[in-house]
Amino acid sequence: YEEMVEFMEKNLLSVAYKIISSIEQKEESRICEGILRLLDSHLIPSSTAAESKSAQDIAAAELAPTHPIRDSTLIMQLLR
């Protein structure tokens, strides 16, 4: 009986962890998409330096959309 209770507790904790992780990932994804939309709609079109636009084009073409370096590359080029 004790083993069954322990197994059920571990199973419930595992399920709860998976649910919470999924919720956090969805929230992070939504926030990142909002930031990328802001970059695409306001900051990138208004940048005047050719290097910033060139870096954005290269990052968009060569890096996967979920690649963490892509976001930091865009932000660093816009801040210059």
Swiss-Prot record:
This protein's source sits in the domain of life called Eukaryota
What Gene3D superfamilies does this protein's entry cite? 14-3-3 domain
For this protein, the record's InterPro entries field holds: 14-3-3_dom_sf, 14-3-3_domain
Q: Give the UniProt family note.
A: Belongs to the 14-3-3 family.
The protein's name in its UniProt record: 14-3-3-like protein 1
